[in-house]
Design a protein with these regions (language model features):
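N-terminal and secondary-structure boundary signal
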Residues: 1-5
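Active-site segment of SDR-like NAD(P)-dependent oxidoreductases
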Residues: 182
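Glycine-rich, histidine-containing beta strand-loop boundary motifs that form or position
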Residues: 52
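Active-site-adjacent loop and "lid" segments of alpha/beta metabolic enzymes
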Residues: 18-39, 55-81, 92-97, 101-104, ...
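Structural preference for beta-strand elements that scaffold enzyme active sites
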Residues: 9-13, 45-49, 84-88, 106-108, ...
Length: 271
C-alpha cells in the first residue's frame, strides 16, 4: 500500500464507548455493535473501525483492561455479522492490538499516535503483518488542543508523517497509511489548511486516510451541532475536497453518504 491507492474506500466508525463526541455512533448494549456493523456493511462500508477508547479532545482516560474488554467483545460481534469485512482497531495500546491480531485476520491497526505512545506497538504490528494507520497528533486527548501551534501546519504535518512512515517501514511494518489528524491538536484554520494541502501529504507516496466526519471545525464554522443535518452536508462537501486531494479512505459516521460521494466523484472524473 505504500503507493497512491488506485481505489477509494469507506471506513465506518463503530464506537464501543459511552462518550464519543457523536452520540449516534456509540454502540452500547446487547447486540448493538452487530446491528451497527451490519447496517454499515449493507450501506457499502469496506472497513469497520472499532474503538474502545474515545480520543476526542478532553476525553477521560480508560483503563487498558476496560478498553480490552470493549474491543474484544465488539470484534466478536462484528465478525459474527461481517466475517469477511476488514476490521480496523482504533487503539494506541499494544495490548489491545495484540489481543485482536492474535485471534483474527484481516485486521488494520489505527493508531492515533503513529506508534509513539506505546513502544511495543510497532513490534506487534510488524510481527502480525498488519497494515497500520499512522496519524499526526500532539500530546494526549487531555492536552492536545493546547498544543495547536504551527508556523506552517501542512509542512509540519507532512514532515512528521514522512519521518514516522519511514521509521515504521524500517521496523518491519509492511503497509503504512497516513492520516493528517484532522481535529487533533489543530485549530479550525489548521484543519481547513490541511484539507486544501492534502495533496502535498499524498505526494509522500502512501495512501491517505481522511477523518473529518462531523468534526468540530465543520460544526463551528456552520454554527451547528454534530447531530445536525448541516454537519453531514458540510462533511460531504469536504469529503469531495479530500478526494480531490488524493484521499484513499474516508473514515465516516454516515456510510451511505460517503459511498455516494465517492461514486459521484469517480463518475465526474471518469475514474
Amino acid at each position: 500500500m505504500n503507493t497512491p491507492a488506485p481505489y477509494r474506500r469507506v471506513m465506518a466508525i463503530v464506537n464501543a464507548t459511552p462518550d464519543s463526541f457523536y452520540a449516534p455512533s456509540r454502540s452500547e448494549g446487547e447486540g448493538a455493535v452487530a446491528r451497527r456493523v451490519a447496517e454499515c456493511v449493507a450501506e457499502g462500508a469496506d472497513i469497520v473501525d472499532i474503538g474502545g477508547y474515545s480520543t476526542r479532545p478532553g476525553a477521560e482516560v480508560v483503563p487498558v483492561e476496560e478498553e480490552l474488554r470493549r474491543v474484544v467483545a465488539a470484534v466478536e460481534e462484528a465478525r459474527r455479522v461481517a466475517p469477511h469485512t476488514t476490521i480496523s482497531i482504533d487503539t494506541f495500546r499494544s495490548e489491545v492490538a495484540e489481543a485482536v491480531l492474535s485471534r483474527w485476520t484481516n485486521v488494520v491497526i489505527n493508531d492515533i499516535t503513529a506508534g509513539e505512545a506505546d513502544g511495543r506497538m510497532v513490534e506487534v504490528v510488524a510481527h502480525w503483518g498488519a497494515p497500520m494507520v499512522a496519524m499526526h497528533t500532539r500530546g494526549t486527548p487531555q492536552t492536545m488542543q493546547s498544543l495547536a501551534h504551527y508556523e506552517d501546519v501542512v509542512a509540519e504535518v507532512r514532515e512528521y508523517l514522512a519521518r514516522r512512515a519511514e521509521w515504521l517501514t524500517s521496523k518491519g511494518v509492511k503497509e503504512v497509511i497516513l492520516d493528517p489528524g484532522f481535529g487533533f491538536a489543530k485549530s479550525v484554520e489548521h484543519n481547513f489548511a490541511l484539507v486544501e494541502g492534502l495533496n502535498t501529504i499524498g505526494a509522500l507516496g502512501y495512501p491517505l486516510l481522511a477523518g473529518i466526519s462531523r468534526k468540530s471545525f465543520i460544526c463551528r464554522t456552520l454554527g451547528v451541532e454534530p447531530t445536525d443535518g448541516l454537519a453531514l452536508a458540510g462533511t460531504t462537501a469536504l469529503h469531495w475536497e479530500c478526494l480531490r486531494g488524493g484521499a484513499a479512505i474516508l473514515r465516516v459516521h454516515d456510510v451511505a453518504a460517503a459511498r455516494a460521494t465517492i461514486e459521484l466523484f469517480e463518475k465526474t472524473y471518469k475514474l
